[in-house]
């Protein structure tokens, strides 16, 4: 809903027609990689920066010195070379179905290591790192918190408890309220959307030992066909005209633009916690693709292509 509303507002403000396609961030990266410098789209809007950083490393984004970047609350929320700019922050955590946990006589997990306890076997929903940027962020987060080898052992143990790896990062949040999974791993603002849609059986949990965050970003594709319109989009995306309509369309992320109206829900549900790690974006830029390969080697003894398609969804 937010993507559609943002495009409509851009058309109203500038008289430029916008065609858009909603894909997970991993799918966007795969698409622009295949298009190899002749992209079918001009800009990328939304989604975690881990796939953006992969695209930077592959030379697929066009740097731009955006004037409205002066309104970012910190330089943390932009690429040092202007390849992408952040518009919101999303906190990684757990969403749990309290009714199902009560029925099963289980306590809610409070930290990452709780997720691998045997009593949660088959109860966890998480996204597929071959398609979802959210899952790539989870992988990078565990590598940065635990070290590479321990992180891969962790994912091997976690896999025993995972019911399904969804195509999109928001997928698990949509499963937890109806009870399709009992514990969802993803961005907590997606959980807020579900709670406010009527699922009052969902509880949000920020991992006690620390967590990380996404920077939801926007960027210009290298070789795009409408460069001036693309630059205008970046300025627009970094403005209140764009970000203030997020909350009107069930998107409750913590905004990182100083002249924006912060959604009350983001503050109410604690989406600016004080225990986030000092996320290493440079490491993510250099190594995400390798870490994803290592993840599949750990949990499937092979590649993403060999993964069980009934659990690792790509559609």
Set out the residue ranges of the language-model regions:
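Short, well-structured alpha-helical segments in soluble
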Residues: 30-37
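Short, polar/charged alpha-helical segment
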Residues: 1-17, 94, 194
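Conserved C-terminal helix/tail region of periplasmic/extracytoplasmic solute-binding proteins
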Residues: 277-315
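A ligand-binding cleft/hinge motif common to bilobed small-molecule-binding domains
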Residues: 50-54, 177, 182-201
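Periplasmic-binding protein-like
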Residues: 90, 154-159, 165, 199-222
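Mature extracytoplasmic/periplasmic domains
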Residues: 216, 221-278
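Extracytoplasmic ligand-binding site segments that recognize negatively charged/polar headgroups
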Residues: 1-4, 26, 39-180
């Amino acid at each position: 809903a937010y993507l559609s509303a943002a495009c409509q507002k851009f058309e109203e403000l500038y008289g430029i027609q916008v065609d858009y396609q909603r894909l997970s961030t991993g799918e966007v990266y795969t698409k622009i990689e295949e298009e190899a410098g002749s992209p079918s789209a001009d800009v990328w809007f939304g989604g975690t920066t881990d796939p953006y950083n992969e695209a930077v490393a592959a030379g697929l984004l066009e740097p731009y010195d955006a004037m409205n970047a002066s309104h970012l609350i910190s330089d943390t929320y932009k690429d040092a070379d202007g390849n992408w700019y952040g518009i919101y922050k999303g906190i990684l955590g757990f969403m749990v179905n309290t009714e199902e946990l009560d029925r099963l006589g289980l306590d809610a997990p409070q930290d990452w290591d709780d997720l691998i306890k045997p009593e949660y076997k088959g109860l966890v929903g998480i996204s597929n790192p071959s398609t979802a940027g959210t899952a790539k962020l989870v992988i990078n987060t565990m590598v940065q918190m635990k070290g590479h080898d321990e992180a891969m052992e962790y994912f091997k143990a976690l896999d025993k408890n995972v019911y399904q790896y969804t195509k999109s990062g928001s997928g698990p949040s949509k499963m937890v309220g109806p009870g399709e999974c009992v514990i969802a791993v993803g961005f907590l603002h997606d959980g807020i959307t579900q709670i406010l849609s009527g699922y009052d059986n969902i509880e949000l949990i920020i991992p006690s030992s620390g967590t990380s965050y996404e920077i939801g970003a926007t960027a210009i594709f290298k070789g795009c066909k409408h460069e001036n319109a693309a630059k205008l989009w970046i300025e627009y995306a970094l403005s209140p005209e764009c970000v203030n309509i997020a909350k009107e369309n069930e998107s409750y992320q913590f905004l990182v633009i100083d002249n924006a109206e912060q959604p009350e829900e983001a503050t109410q549900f604690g989406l600016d916690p004080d225990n986030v790690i000092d996320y290493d974006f440079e490491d993510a830029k250099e190594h995400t693709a390798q870490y994803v390969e290592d993840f599949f080697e750990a949990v499937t003894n092979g590649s993403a292509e060999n993964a069980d398609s009934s659990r690792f969804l790509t559609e």
